Amino acid sequence: MQLKFKNGKFRILQVSDAQDLQHVRHTMMRMLNKAYDDLKPDLIVLTGDNILGNHLNDCELWTPLFVKDKPSEMKAMGVAIDKLISPIEERKIPFAMIYGNHDDRNRMTKDEQADFYRQYSCNIGLDGTDSGDCDTYNIPIYSENGDKIKFNIWMLDTAWHDKEKDECFEYVKPEAVEWYKDTSAKLKAQNGGVPVPSLMFQHIPMLETLELIEECDSADKDAVRGPDNKYFKLKPECQGHLGEYVSAVSQKTGQMEAMKESGDIKAVVFGHDHQNCFTGVVDGINFVQTPCASFRCYGNFCRGVRVFDIDEATGDYETFTLTYNDIVGKSLWNDLCYIWDADDMVKKKIALIAGTAGGLLAIGAGVTLGLLL
């Protein structure tokens, strides 16, 4: 499938950390479906932790545990992925995906899981045979007449689960960096010696992201707790919200040097940190952090999606985020749905249930007293 600019524009919708199961949280899907309809993206990128792969054996309340082996776990995985992808497929929107640190923490390999995504006609990519990982690949975006690559999307894997060691590794593999350098050079050569402007998506933030935060006093209104009981906030030149300390990859493998050498990266875009939503610049490259979409995990008021609008003529982009309330609107019903489905709203949910129960008891007592009188 060839992606093309339309009237000089191309819109990407990023959904990060959808992180759900076969029993999907309906509030997230309602938010995403409305975002798809309202924003009309040319491409949807799912940037990791698309499913909660290490909890596929979880069950609904009052139902027995039904995932006991690989075939049943694979079935649960297929249902979870279908709940996320079917709305995209129904709208015939091209989509691309990468894995996060939760997707393959189960009995399935990444390639086995990729087969579920590949069965959808709107899937782009997952063909990283040269890069070493199925979810490390690039997506060219062509001019409207299809004769020239005008922009490029890089998708890089940052986490994988070693089944034998039962251990998760979190960094960009050195061979992936080499693949990026080689492929970027080929695209540059095809473009008359000029780097093809690009966005790079990966799940876990680069270690260089830590250069965008600074230590501060615990009393600072923007402070978040970090290692060694120290507190941090975004540097003044950054824009957005720091809701938690940056959880970056475990090691550097030459990625930053490769990006600067290649000269094609307009921005590198991350997910993973559910409560962070900010942008900043490191060594001339834009760093973009996108919050989670999931309700089956911790999060905050930033929960939503991110949009990238790319201009064909300049190769530049504009980006913005939309929160749950931006997308579905502000109303009592939408607020109740949010409280009911979001894992970080458990205390409010309990208070809501208790308050409702107390109100019903009071009404019942009043009716009973009225009958007695």
Protein language model regions, located:
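N-terminal active-site segment of His-dependent metallophosphoesterases
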Residues: 1-78, 82-83
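Extended active-site neighborhood of metal-dependent phosphoesterases/phosphodiesterases
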Residues: 1-4, 65-194, 258, 307-309
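Mobile, glycine- and charge-enriched loop segments
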Residues: 1-28, 189-195, 201-214, 218-248, ...
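Binuclear metal-dependent phosphoesterase catalytic core
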Residues: 1-2, 138-147, 246-247, 253-262, ...
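Active-site-proximal beta-strand elements of phosphoester/diester hydrolases
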Residues: 9-19, 150-160, 201, 286-292
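Active-site environment of divalent metal-dependent phosphoester hydrolases
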Residues: 21-23, 52-55, 97-108, 161-164, ...
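His/acidic metal-ligating clusters that form di-metal
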Residues: 39-43, 152-154, 166-274
